[in-house]
Curated annotation (Swiss-Prot):
GO terms for molecular function: molybdenum ion binding; oxidoreductase activity; oxidoreductase activity, acting on other nitrogenous compounds as donors; protein homodimerization activity; pyridoxal phosphate binding. Residues 26-163 form the MOSC domain. Disulfide bonds: none annotated. GO terms for biological process: response to toxic substance; toxin catabolic process. Monomer. NCBIfam families: PRK11536.1 (NF008577). One of its GO terms (cellular component) is cytosol. This is Protein YiiM.
Length: 224
């Protein structure tokens, strides 16, 4: 199955309280180089929590925009791609039918699903909606991130094509394990066994198993 894709990149900008972000992106056409760190011309702020080899690309399903426009009718005009800061936008791929570790061919490159996107408080400023990061997490409409396992030239003219599936954990299930379920060591083990899981999510699940408790999400979701 092949999925046509729209492609977006962005530059770092200042947001309220002086926090930088590259969430504002623009559509790009033509050929780009995709490296292990992401798309040519795309920037990430605060690289401790954004970007890097495990989180080189962000994918957000176009299907979700109608949901958000209905939830916030007064701001409906905001909810068009790439409003959530995604690099890739498609129809037909969602958290329910994409699996952890899925490998897609994109042009000359190969990319692998590494984790659900962990929404952060900068989205609240970006949309001027105080709790949209929390709402994304609650609904599971978060999208997902990729690592780049084979760099190469890519473009919006090259569709995504699934070439390998080795996991039984969907992105939707991974998000539920991480954020919605009570402490469950067996589910953490299941998630840790999923191919390609990012280092940051691996550390988080390992810490939970060692500590016996779930970490606080408030700093990521609210910035405090």
């Amino acid at each position: 199955m092949r999925y046509p894709v729209d492609v977006y990149t962005g530059k770092i900008q200042a947001y309220p309280e002086g926090k930088p972000s590259a969430i504002a992106k623009i559509q790009v056409d033509g050929e780009l180089m995709l490296t292990e760190l992401g798309l040519e011309g795309d920037e990430q702020a605060e690289k401790k929590v954004h970007g890097g080899p495990d989180r080189a690309l962000c994918h957000y399903p176009r299907e979700h925009y109608l949901y958000w426009a209905r939830e916030f009718p007064e701001q409906a005009e905001l909810f068009v791609a790439p409003a959530f800061g995604e690099n890739l936008s498609t129809d037909g791929l969602t958290e329910s039918n994409v699996y952890m570790g899925d490998i897609f061919r994109w042009g000359e490159a190969l990319i692998q699903v590494s984790q659900p996107r962990s929404p952060c408080y900068k989205l609240n400023y970006h949309f001027d909606i105080s709790d949209i990061a929390q709402l994304m997490q609650n609904t599971g409409k978060v999208g997902w991130l990729y690592s780049v396992i084979a760099p190469g030239k890519v473009s919006a003219d090259a569709p995504l094509e699934l070439v390998s599936r080795v996991s039984d954990v969907t992105v939707q299930e991974a998000a539920a394990i991480a954020w919605h379920m009570p402490f469950d060591d067996d589910q953490y083990h299941r998630l840790l066994s999923a191919a390609g899981l990012s280092k940051s999510w691996t550390r988080t699940m390992q810490k939970r198993r060692l500590s016996g408790k779930i970490e606080d999400f408030s700093r990521r979701l609210w910035g405090k």
